[in-house]
């Protein structure tokens, strides 16, 4: 009886190495398939990135931005092994409601350069006050480098009298009537920066009245308008 008990007790001990081998094989299989630990983490990582992209897409779709490709050129970088060629893109982005920005991006491929420039433009958007939502409040000048631009307010029906990079800015900004003039260099980068310098100086009667602590009608009345006309114009100003 004692021998039989020893034999039965030894049987599970002999089966233990096989069980350990199966456990090791299962462990290797889990790592190989990537289904238990690290594979699950990778899956969650992909899903997480996908959800973040979807959120960004929904925000961009709700904003409905206007994107204009202004200029693209080929660039090169000299390194130890020779030259690396790529592309540089200049993009203007706006919402058509008084906000616009520009961005510059470089990459080895054209689509990637445009994508980088668009992302930079969205981060650099500025608000420009518009009169009646169609034109500027007053004339302005801007310069950058050798480029100098002049922007003027215009009556209804004038349209956008601008060319090249400046037209892209006003179309994305939502301006319907404006007269512009560019003097000096025709470099699109300088023209874009000079135009934004002129737009940053734009002020509205509402902001001036808040800064000076006066009524909008009082400011408009100083231009020679009668009190009723000044009050009507002040009531029509939204920004």
Curated annotation (Swiss-Prot):
SUPFAM superfamilies: dsRNA-binding domain-like, Ribosomal protein S5 domain 2-like. Residues 34-62 have a biased composition (Basic and acidic residues). Residues 9-19 have a biased composition (Low complexity). Residues 65-128 form the S5 DRBM domain. Residues 1-62 are annotated as: Disordered. Keywords: Ribonucleoprotein, Ribosomal protein, RNA-binding, rRNA-binding. GO terms for molecular function: rRNA binding; structural constituent of ribosome. InterPro entries: Ribosomal_Su5_D2-typ_SF, Ribosomal_uS5, Ribosomal_uS5_bac-type, Ribosomal_uS5_C, Ribosomal_uS5_N, Ribosomal_uS5_N_CS, Ribsml_uS5_D2-typ_fold_subgr. GO terms for biological process: translation. It comes from the Bacteria. NCBIfam families: rpsE_bact. Part of the 30S ribosomal subunit. Contacts proteins S4 and S8. Belongs to the universal ribosomal protein uS5 family. The N-terminal domain interacts with the head of the 30S subunit; the C-terminal domain interacts with the body and contacts protein S4. The interaction surface between S4 and S5 is involved in control of translational fidelity. With S4 and S12 plays an important role in translational accuracy. Located at the back of the 30S subunit body where it stabilizes the conformation of the head with respect to the body. This is Small ribosomal subunit protein uS5. It comes from Rhizorhabdus wittichii (strain DSM 6014 / CCUG 31198 / JCM 15750 / NBRC 105917 / EY 4224 / RW1) (Sphingomonas wittichii). The gene is rpsE.
């Amino acid at each position: 009886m004692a021998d039989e008990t020893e034999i039965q007790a030894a049987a599970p001990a002999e089966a233990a190495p096989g069980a350990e081998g199966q456990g090791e094989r299962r462990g290797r299989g889990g790592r190989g398939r990537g289904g238990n630990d690290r594979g699950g983490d990778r899956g969650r990582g992909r899903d997480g990135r996908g959800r973040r992209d979807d959120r960004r897409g929904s925000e961009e779709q709700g904003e409905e931005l206007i994107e204009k490709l202004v200029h693209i050129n080929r660039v090169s970088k000299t390194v130890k092994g020779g030259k690396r060629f790529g592309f540089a893109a200049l993009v203007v982005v706006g919402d058509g409601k008084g906000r616009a920005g520009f961005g510059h991006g470089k990459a080895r491929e054209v689509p990637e350069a445009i994508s980088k420039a668009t992302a930079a433009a969205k981060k650099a958007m500025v608000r420009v006050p518009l009169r009646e939502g169609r034109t500027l409040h007053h004339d302005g000048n801007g310069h950058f480098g050798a480029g100098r631009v002049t922007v003027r307010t215009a009556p209804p029906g004038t349209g956008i009298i601008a060319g090249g990079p400046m037209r892209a800015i006003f179309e994305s900004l939502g301006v319907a009537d404006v007269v512009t003039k560019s003097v000096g260099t025709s470099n699109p980068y300088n023209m874009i920066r000079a135009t934004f310098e002129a737009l940053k100086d734009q002020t509205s009667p509402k902001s001036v009245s808040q800064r000076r602590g006066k009524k909008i009608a009082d400011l408009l009345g100083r231009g020679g308008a009668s009190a009723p006309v000044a009050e009507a114009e002040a009531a029509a100003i939204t920004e």
